[in-house]
Amino acid sequence: MTDSYQMEDIKNSNETSISLQNVTISYGDSDAVRNVYFDIPKYKVTSLIGPSGCGKSTVLRSLNRMNDLISSCTLKGLILFEGLDLYSDQIDPVEVRRKIGMVFQQPNPFPKSIYENIAFGARINGFSGNLDELVEDSLRKAAVWDECKDKLNESGYSLSGGQQQRLCIARTIAIKPDVILMDEPCSALDPISTIKIEETIHELKKNFTIVIVTHNMQQALRVSDKTAFFNAAEKGGTDDGKVGYLVEFDKTKKIFNSPKEKATQDYISGKFG
């Protein structure tokens, strides 16, 4: 990344964190999702919902360039973060992923101690402060400090599934991102662990912008401020596959209580999906 594009120097005073402008994402010659427009607000939770195959996870991964790891994946259009083109040739994808962190569907702690799960990433990113304080602060923000404080030197694998997922959230927090992406973070967890994660999300939005993919309609309603509903349609022509598209984006309560589109109403009422 060149000096003129240092992401930590980019601060936009408006209320938008990330803006997608006519985004089409393809794998090879096949479009996965087309013509997506919406703005992700700062310090809010935005949910991406829709049936399997509608492109919501593909869109989520595009927000921090995780799709770059798939050689056949290409993107057209613009994704702006604080007004900066994330796909500019002058932007370092590694720096993008530091500013826009990701929590995956399955808990994936490092094969290290609980302490090192937090400290390792901060250390390799040049953190020069008090690591003990950083570890405690990150674990507290992820609501897992009480479960971890007496066994910081034990393996991250010693924790339960829900605790491991909150450890992964703490690990992401420790890098000091601006945005946290979550790809179905509760799908592998029991109901009690899910409640803990949702409570954590409510607390995290005080300091972070959060984007979450979920198949759980009630979860989207509980945790998010804005919701984007995606659907999939037949591509037509010689291609018998489907392509995802954004149907509707609005305040979550409006999406669930008075959606503009019939497809949205049908999906949230369980008629398909």
Swiss-Prot record:
It catalyses: phosphate(out) + ATP + H2O = ADP + 2 phosphate(in) + H(+). The gene is pstB. It comes from Prochlorococcus marinus (strain SARG / CCMP1375 / SS120). Residues 18-257 form the ABC transporter domain. NCBIfam families: 3a0107s01c2. One of its GO terms (cellular component) is plasma membrane. Its main location: membrane. The keyword NAD does not apply. GO terms for biological process: phosphate ion transmembrane transport. It holds the Pfam family ABC_tran. Signal peptide: none annotated. Part of the ABC transporter complex PstSACB involved in phosphate import. Responsible for energy coupling to the transport system. One of its GO terms (molecular function) is ATP binding. It is a peripheral membrane protein. Its EC number is 7.3.2.1. Belongs to the ABC transporter superfamily. Phosphate importer (TC 3.A.1.7) family. The keyword Cell membrane applies. The complex is composed of two ATP-binding proteins (PstB), two transmembrane proteins (PstC and PstA) and a solute-binding protein (PstS). ATP binds at G50, P51, S52, G53, C54, G55, K56, S57. This is Phosphate import ATP-binding protein PstB. It is found in: Cell inner membrane.
